[in-house]
């Protein structure tokens, strides 16, 4: 009897080593090395010749199936594509299972036949949640299983009746080919690879729910994200009632698209007036508060930027940013000090994006700078105004992409003053162009 060999693999970068260590020598992550058993019973398999195709051959657009959830359709690029594999991650309790159960129980126009497979709950728990969510589509099939071979055999037995399969979650699925426990790198990689191949061979849509680490990254090997066609993150704060579904990879659409949802006692609801969700209605502007006209994917979104500046006796005053890059905040402070003489070295500075949103758009620089200047001078910003524009190290305001989209969203919500970089081919009376931070300072005065 041959003895199986073993090696050690990093759960973060999949680097292989022959002995255990506390830290991965390749990516430097601590505590990520796990043991993996290698089966030695391998036979030599020869390949067969494959026919080549030409890049210039005609190909039709992928058939998209629109879901009853319009926000999900937007994130996916128009709907579900047959034969695609979709990965959706998020923190525990954020609403992944609820969203997927509502999707499978939805009334598709194309009469999709859906199967919901759970490896974390019992069938009675799924039924109780369906009752709580007032789901009345009892034609949705449900299955409690964790073995890969059993799952594929069950789908094969009803191959003509299943169009969409949800697996919650991929970390609970195991294969008989491996002796390692569920959730290990080898189990996740092997099971995900088999499921993705199966979906493409049988033209079935597969949605895989997955856990995330404490850093917010998808748990398991990075290859998991490479295997699937689409990677979605369900973001949000447990203290807030809204959720953001964001696409980080999409072979059939654009990345960066977001869908806005609201958690309620009856499940997850779509939000149509998404900008109003993140804005507080006030009669007058508050010192240190500005409105940023942003774009997430193709969706315009207005967000509130708040800044607070207080004197400090500390040798190194605190700099805190919630929902924004702290390094970029330091850069903006340095530019304000160097270019317009706003010295905040002896002050504690707190910056927050209201509603728990996270902004990575460089065009938010101008809104942040406006909030900081307003907080430092105790002068409220102009009424009903929005800001967008990227700030360079020289203090100049750079051009911004999708400016017209941002302006139209601001006008739609009742804002009558747009403070931004200099625009070409756009001449509106309510646009106040800035070419330098000095211009912004004059506007606030």
From Swiss-Prot:
InterPro entries: AAA+_ATPase, DNA_repair_RadA, KaiC-like_dom, P-loop_NTPase, RecA_ATP-bd, Ribosomal_Su5_D2-typ_SF, Ribsml_uS5_D2-typ_fold_subgr, Rubredoxin_2. It comes from the Bacteria. One of its GO terms (cellular component) is cytosol. Its EC number is 3.6.4.-. A motif (RadA KNRFG motif) lies at residues 249-253. It holds the Pfam family ATPase. Keywords: ATP-binding, DNA damage, DNA repair, DNA-binding, Hydrolase, Metal-binding, Nucleotide-binding, Stress response, Zinc, Zinc-finger. One of its GO terms (molecular function) is zinc ion binding. It is an enzyme of class 3 (hydrolase). GO terms for biological process: recombinational repair. SMART domains: AAA (SM00382). Has a putative N-terminal zinc-finger, a middle region with homology to RecA with ATPase motifs including the RadA KNRFG motif, while the C-terminus is homologous to Lon protease. DNA-dependent ATPase involved in processing of recombination intermediates, plays a role in repairing DNA breaks. Stimulates the branch migration of RecA-mediated strand transfer reactions, allowing the 3' invading strand to extend heteroduplex DNA faster. Binds ssDNA in the presence of ADP but not other nucleotides, has ATPase activity that is stimulated by ssDNA and various branched DNA structures, but inhibited by SSB. Does not have RecA's homology-searching function. HAMAP family: RadA_bact (MF_01498). This is DNA repair protein RadA.
């Amino acid at each position: 009897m041959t003895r199986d060999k073993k090696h050690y693999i990093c759960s973060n970068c999949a680097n292989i080593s022959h002995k255990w260590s506390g830290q991965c020598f390749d990516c430097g992550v601590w505590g990520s090395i796990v043991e993996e058993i290698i089966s030695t019973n391998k036979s030599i398999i020869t390949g067969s010749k494959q026919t080549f195709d030409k890049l210039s051959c005609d190909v039709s657009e992928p058939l998209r199936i629109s879901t009853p959830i319009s926000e999900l359709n937007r994130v996916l690029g128009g709907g579900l594509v047959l034969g695609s594999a979709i990965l959706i991650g998020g923190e525990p309790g954020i609403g992944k299972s609820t969203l997927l159960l509502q999707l499978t129980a939805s009334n598709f126009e194309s009469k999709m036949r859906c199967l919901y497979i759970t490896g974390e709950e019992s069938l009675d728990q799924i039924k109780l949640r369906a009752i709580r969510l007032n789901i009345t589509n009892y034609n949705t099939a449900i299955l409690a299983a964790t073995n890969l071979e059993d799952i594929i055999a069950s789908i094969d037995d009803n191959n003509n009746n299943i169009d969409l399969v949800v697996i919650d979650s991929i970390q609970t699925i195991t294969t008989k080919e491996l002796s390692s426990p569920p959730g290990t790198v080898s189990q996740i990689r092997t099971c995900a690879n088999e499921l993705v191949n199966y979906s493409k061979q049988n033209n079935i849509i597969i949605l895989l729910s997955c856990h995330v680490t404490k850093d917010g990254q998808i748990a398991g090997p990075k290859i998991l994200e490479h295997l699937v066609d689409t990677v979605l993150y369900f973001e949000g704060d447990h203290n807030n009632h809204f959720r953001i579904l964001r696409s980080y990879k999409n072979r059939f659409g654009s990345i960066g698209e977001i869908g806005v949802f609201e958690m309620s006692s009856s499940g997850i609801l779509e939000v149509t007036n998404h900008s109003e969700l993140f804005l507080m209605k006030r009669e007058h502007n508050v010192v240190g508060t500005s409105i940023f006209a942003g774009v997430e994917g193709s969706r315009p979104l207005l967000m509130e930027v708040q800044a607070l500046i207080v004197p400090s006796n500390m040798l190194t005053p605190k700099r805190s940013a919630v929902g924004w890059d702290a390094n970029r905040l330091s850069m903006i402070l340095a530019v304000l000090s160097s270019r317009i003489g706003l010295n905040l070295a002896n002050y504690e500075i707190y910056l927050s994006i209201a509603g728990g949103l996270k902004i990575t758009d460089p065009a938010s620089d101008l809104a942040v700078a406006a909030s900081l200047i307003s907080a430092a001078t105790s002068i409220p910003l102009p009424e009903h105004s929005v800001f967008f524009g990227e700030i360079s190290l020289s203090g100049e305001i750079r051009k911004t992409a999708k400016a017209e989209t941002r302006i139209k969203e601001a006008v739609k919500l009742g804002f009558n003053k747009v403070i931004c970089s200099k625009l070409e081919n756009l001449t509106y009376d309510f646009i106040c162009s800035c070419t330098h931070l000095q211009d912004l300072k004059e506007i606030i005065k």
